[in-house]
Design a protein with these regions (language model features):
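Single-stranded RNA-binding regions, centering on S1/OB-family and related RNA-binding modules
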Residues: 1-220
Length: 220
């Protein structure tokens, strides 16, 4: 966003209205009017729309693993990388949350409060009915849970699939993220995924790694 005004408490960024404040503690040294800054917009503890150069663990629509830092009768607060913790309403928790524990949650925009919040109950947001991915396509994966045959994973925060134990050579835990690709889609839209890159890209990457190792070891 473009800087439109410099004041003693920070700078104002252009939102085509009155401007959004970026507090002084987040303003990069030497920032001036006309500069473009990469920021995240959210409501602070006083319900003001505010900007920050801090980057959260996720944005609206993302499914991420976050730690609980405090619990109240109304819900729990989780650390997501910003000064203001993200709130998980009691009604959006599965079995309750505990300080110090980590939980897999989906970040969403609460339509009533217009604030960013998080929920453990995100299964309804995941569907394979209409797929937005195809075979051999590169995707982002989040490990959801273990099954008898492999890891049940979330694909691009939208779909679900299975990463078979035989296709992965390291131990994974719920919340782990990795890049992969669509190995197979069945007629009923069940998806198998593989870690890494597909086909030629995978071979090229492995070849480059081997050449790099040979170079480091003088060809041996």
């Amino acid at each position: 966003m473009k800087v439109i005004r410099v004041v003693s408490i920070g700078v104002y960024l252009d939102d085509e209205k009155e401007g959004i404040l970026l507090p002084k503690r987040y303003v990069p040294e030497g920032t001036d009017i006309g500069d473009e800054l990469n920021v995240f917009i959210y409501h602070d503890s006083e319900s003001r729309v505010i900007a920050t150069t801090q980057q959260p663990a996720g944005t609206v629509g993302d499914i991420v693993m976050l730690p609980v830092v405090s619990v109240t009768p109304q819900g729990a607060f989780m650390d997501w990388g910003l000064q203001k913790d993200i709130f998980v309403p009691k009604s959006k928790q599965r079995l309750g949350m505990h300080v110090g524990e980590k939980y897999l949650v989906k970040i969403y925009l609460d339509e009533q409060t217009e604030r960013v919040a998080a929920t453990e109950k995100f299964d309804a947001f995941l569907s394979n009915e209409i797929l937005t991915v195809g075979e051999m396509e590169q995707v982002s994966l989040v490990v959801y849970r273990r099954t008898d045959i492999g890891y049940f994973v979330i694909i691009n925060n939208k779909h679900t699939g299975v990463l078979h134990y035989s296709d992965v050579f390291t131990e994974l835990e719920p919340g782990d993220t990795l890049k992969g690709f669509i190995k197979k889609i069945t007629e009923d839209n069940k998806i198998d995924v593989m870690p890494g890159k597909p086909g030629y890209e995978r071979v090229t990457d492995e070849g480059e790694k081997i050449l790099s190792l040979l170079a480091e070891n003088s060809g041996y």
